[in-house]
Structures are given as C-alpha cells and as structure tokens.
Amino acid sequence: MVRSGKNGDLHLKQIAYYKRTGEYHPTTLPSERRGIRRAAKKFVFKEKKLFYVGKDRKQNRLVIVSEEEKKKVLRECHENDSGAHHGISRTLTLVESNYYWTSVTNDVKQWVYACQHCQVAKNTVIVAPKQHLLKVENPWSLVTVDLMGPFHTSNRSHVYAVIMTDLFTKWIVILPLCDVSASEVSKAIINIFFLYGPPQKIIMDQRDEFIQQINIELYRLFGIKQIVISHTSGSVNPTESTPNTIKAFLSKHCADHPNNWDDHLSAVSFAFNVTHLEPTKNTPYFQMFSRNPYMPETSDSLHEVDGDNTSMFAKILDAIKEADKIMENKTTSLGQMENNNLDELNKSKIIVKKKPKQLNPFHLKVGHEVLRQRKNWWKDGRFQSEWVGPCVIDYITESGCAVLRDNTGVRLKRPIKMSHLKPYIRESSEQESLYLLQGSVVADHDYIGLPEIPVGAYQANILVEDATIGIVDNELLTSSKDRELLEYRNTKVSPLIDDHSSLEKQTFSLLDSSNQVLEYLS
C-alpha cells in the first residue's frame, strides 16, 4: 500500500532499488521501510525489468514508471486493430492483464474521458430508419414467393414446388421444381414473368445470401435489378402471405398422388383462383381480370368423362370446396367454443360485493368506553393482534380518528382509527362493584356529561328505579329462569336500599338535632 500523499512512481522506484541492491533508497523514510519490505515480496526482477507477481506469484505484469510509457500503454489498450475504441472497463482489463502501476485505474478513466473520438461517438445518436410497409393498391404489384417440399419424386423428377401469391387479388400460381437452387427458382419466376409480367417487388422468406443470388440470376435472365426483398425487412404485413389452406391442400394432394402430383399443379391453382372467396366476396380470378371465367352451366359435364369416370379437375375442384367447408366449419366451431368458454367463465365468476368501509361501525361517541386493537404484537413466536384497554374517547378529530385517555386519565399520543375500536362491555361483577363504589363511579363517569347531583340522591334514584322496574317486570315474567334472575337481582339490590334508607334517616336525625340547638341558642 502507498501511504496517502506519496508519489506512486517514487514508491515503485524505492521497491526496485530495494530489490536490486537489498538496501533502502535514500528517499525512504524510516517509517516506510517496513512497508517497502512487505511490498517487495510481490515483485521480481526478470531480464533487468521489474515485474509484479502478486501474493500468489502467478501474475506477470510489467511495472511502468515513466509517463511516456504509460501513455503508450494506454493508447495501445484503448484502441484495437480495427480502429474502434474500448470503454473504461475493457481498457482497464487489457492494461491490468500485462502492466502495473499504482494509479492505473484513475489514469484509464482520465484517458477515456479525454479521448476526443469517444466523446464524439458518445454524443452521436444513430437513428434507425423507419420501415414503411409497402402499400398494395393494384393487382400483381406485390407478390410473395414460397417454396414447398420436398415431396415424393414425380415421374418428371420434380421434388419441390414454388407458389407465387398476389397480395392484392390472392391470385396464385404453382410451378414444380427439380431443386431449390437459385438458378432453378429464378427460371420458374421468369416463366411467370412471361405470363403476367414482372411485379414491382417480390417478397421471399429466405436468407439474404439466397435472395442476393436470385437477384443476380433475374438480372442476368430478365435484366431487372433488386426486385426480390426479404420477408424479414418489415416491408409487408406477415399475415398477408400465402394462405395456409393452399399449403395444407397441396401437401395432402402431393401425398395422395406421389408419381404425378406435378401434372395437377395448374389445375390446383386454377381451382383455388375460381373458388377461394376473399373477404370482398370476389374470387381471385375476378379480382385479377375484373370478370368471372366461363364455366359449364352444369357440373355434369365436368363429372361425366368417358361414362363413369370423373375428370381430374372436377375431383380437385370438389376436394378444394370440401376443404373450404371443413375449414369454415372448424372456424365456426372454434368461435362457438370460445363463446361458450367465455359464457362459462362469466357464469363461474363469483361476484363479490365489497362492503363499504365503515369509519365508525359501532357509532362511538365522545365519552364512550372502548377497547383499541393492538396489531402486529409479537407473542408466542408469531405476530398477533389483541384488544387492550379500556380507554375513554376524549374527542374525535376531523379525519374521523379518536383521541383516547387511559384509566389514569393520561391522553394517548396518537389518534386511533374508529375502525380499530370497539365498545367495552363490563361484566356483571364489574357492574356490582360500580354500584358499591359510589365515589369511583362518579369519578369514572364524570366525562359522560351527566348532571351534577348529590351522590346519595343519584345513586338512590338509580337503585330505586331498578327496584321498581324489577317489581313491574315480575308481573310480566312467566318463565322460571326469568324469575330466578329477578330474585337474584332483588337480593342484591335490597341490602343497598336498606343501607340507603338508614343513611337518609341518619341525615334527617342530624338535621333535627341541629335545629334544636339553634332554637336553644336563640
């Protein structure tokens, strides 16, 4: 370690001097000698050059001292052979893999920050060109090319098929191929050019090298440049390609006729062009030529060939119509299944009506005794909630929270939500103690807002009213349990009434004696 404020180059010179001579450099302070000895263990001399090997002695990094050598190393590690510039992390990795000096990290950062080329490249934003979808506005202006196969080798040695689809009319042309080389595909495309003319663009879902070879062949054969583009260029909507129905039917037809499937490709394409309806309810033939083809009035002429034999085109036409019906039914059934599934999901959904949040569910008011909920209380190894109290509601804030006081009358620091409170219901034993402890009753219930009346009169009124209510209710009670409860209550109340009557008698006797004394004095 280099002490704070010490020059790193001087530190390395002192280590090199110590490793070479075994003595300390004249500039070495006595307090630095121990550090020089410990640091020297990580360096070795090789061919009169100092190398840093580290604690494990597995590294082999040349020690750089002079500023010129540092700049040379930084320039070599920051720029690669291709002329590109590395960032801080990569440059630091390259420097530390072969070279060593004490301030290597800071020097690399300053070098990269000061590099003019890096600053210009950092502030330059490369905006990718926007890819615009080609608009299909006219027939035979934008065509897709798909390759299918390999199929069973036909009698004419055809193994593959090429399908050209016009994206505007959905007109298709199918031709057989012996292989899928660029020259073979280009010859098939040229034959279609001679029938319908070249389109504006041809889209293929192939690799760029193959597309470039086809463009070269088309330029050699037809003299047109860069007409074929890649499907991945984003110039066309992926859904606007060869319909899957055609591919599926062609695969099945080639499997059913392994030897002569290539003889029927023109019939298959014509059958699709005259029957395959588009969303506009017009056939591709009508879209292409603005008219319908001439077809026999009855289908009998198509089916009756040499008596009982049926023409191949009629078979293909019927098969395509059947495939369209199957596809339509499948689409309809899938739509119905989706609708049924949605209906079942809607029926199975349980509509849970959330109760509105009640800010004061118990209709608590100022002066009520309540228990407050204490949540997240750690007890018995887990968090629990419990009700503590009782407390008294001192007042209610504007936000609907209650400020409480405990039994000692001390106000709690934080307001409590009304939803975290519930009424405190006293037990029977506590109610009896309230009747007996009259002074404490008044002290505890002074906050309720009762009128200030003498203790004896207030308590006597309560007891007398309770006793009269019990007597009246006794006439109405018929069940044995109610009578037992009333008798128990009367037994508890009657001694208190007697005590209260004796107390009143003593009070009146004291008043009489005081009157007599006043008369005597007068």
UniProtKB/Swiss-Prot annotation:
Transmembrane segments: none annotated. GO terms for biological process: DNA integration. GO terms for molecular function: nucleic acid binding. Coiled coil: none annotated. The modification Phosphoserine is found at S502. Residues 135-292 form the Integrase catalytic domain. PANTHER family: PROTEIN CBG26694 (PTHR37984), PROTEIN NYNRIN-LIKE (PTHR37984:SF5). This is Gypsy retrotransposon integrase-like protein 1. It comes from Pongo abelii. The gene is GIN1.
